[in-house]
Amino acid sequence: PNSTKMAELIQRYLNDVGVNATIVSYDWATFRRHLQEGLHDSVLIGWSADNGDPDNFYRPLLSCGAIPSGTNRAMWCNEDYDRLLDRAIETEDIDERRVIYQQVNRLLYEKLPLVPIAHAYRYQAFRTELDGMAINPYGGVRFGGVSKVQ
């Protein structure tokens, strides 16, 4: 998704309901500092998980412990939410984890600390002359074990 176009679209929607929003952009270092210091009313930013575990979205984005690092941009802290995350990560039973994450989703739906807007598709192409090349569903390109077929 194009962040500038997305911000402008959101700004228009907010204006339509009487909310005046100003779009402000910063260099990355200033942006990170402002996030960590809570110098924002709202923020538009992306997140990409680097593994398939739901905890890789839920914990860094919204747990109490993620506020100091700046990844919890909502600066939202809910002890019930954190307890559910701890229960989910501590169990190896997939069905039990599914039930716990459904409870997590219900809590997020009720409290709405953030609004997911879009999820990007990632495309990756490679030549058939490469042996051992695999597409990683979490992004990144790994060349270990890749060789060129003669």
State each model region's role.
Residues 1-51, 73, 94, 122:
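Ligand/substrate-recognition segments at binding pockets and active sites
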Residues 34-39, 59-90, 119-150:
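Short, solvent-exposed loop/beta-turn-alpha elements that line the ligand-binding surface or hinge
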Residues 26, 30, 83, 99-100:
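Short, conserved clusters of charged catalytic residues that mark active-site
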Residues 55-56:
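Long, cytosolic, alpha-helical-rich C-terminal regions that act as interaction/scaffolding modules
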Residues 39, 43-47, 91-128:
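Bilobed periplasmic-binding protein-like "clamshell/Venus-flytrap" ligand-binding domains
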Residues 1-12, 16-17, 77-79, 83-84, ...:
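Append "and occasionally in soluble cytosolic enzymes with long acidic Gly/Pro-rich linkers
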